């Protein structure tokens, strides 16, 4: 049995940190219905859809993201009015929190909450924790959406140096439609 003990000093301890940087392309073929089997799970409540990398009934399927749409009062949409308002309010409570008066804040275009353009209609994409782990690296997010003959690319340009910290859930970057990230031009 050992009877000799060594005291560890502060210089005897080494701390290392490894950042995992991986690009995860989610191609349009997964969400467009290109494959014969369904990768998109539609729920009876019609509040959101879940997207998988393989047919969702397969044991190999991994959940990639959920997508939903929500709006606040004053929006023109009528289909499932209460459900869509509940989605907006739920996401706003979690992501932007409450005003000092106790009201749910609206999503803000530039993230400042003190004036500016408020988003009344929002599309929410909730990525699986399996994919994003602890965070998406700031300045690396790009989303390209095709609709018919038009295409739009959204990215968090400059977010590694210009991000917001006023969310109850942590840090976030503003999405822009061009590489010129000028104040007040964010899309969400």
Regions found by a protein language model. Name each.
Residues 1-188:
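Long, position-biased, composition-driven segments near the start of the mature protein
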């Amino acid at each position: 049995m050992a009877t000799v003990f060594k005291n560890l000093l502060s210089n005897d301890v080494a701390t290392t940190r490894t950042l995992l940087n991986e690009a995860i392309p989610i191609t349009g073929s997964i969400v467009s219905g290109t494959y014969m089997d369904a990768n998109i799970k539609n729920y009876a409540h019609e509040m959101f859809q879940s997207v998988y990398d393989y047919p969702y009934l397969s044991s190999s399927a991994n959940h990639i993201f959920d997508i939903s749409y929500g709006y606040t009062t004053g929006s023109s949409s009528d289909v499932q009015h209460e459900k869509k308002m509940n989605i907006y309010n739920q996401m706003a409570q979690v992501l932007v929190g409450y005003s000092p008066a106790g009201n749910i804040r609206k999503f803000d275009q530039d993230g400042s909450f003190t004036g500016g353009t408020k988003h009344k209609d929002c599309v929410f994409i909730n990525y699986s924790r399996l994919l994003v782990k602890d965070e998406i690296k700031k300045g690396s997010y790009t989303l390209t959406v095709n609709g018919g003959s038009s295409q739009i690319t959204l990215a968090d340009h400059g977010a590694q140096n210009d991000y917001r910290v006023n969310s109850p859930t942590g840090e976030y970057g503003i999405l822009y439609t061009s590489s010129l990230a000028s104040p007040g031009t964010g899309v969400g």
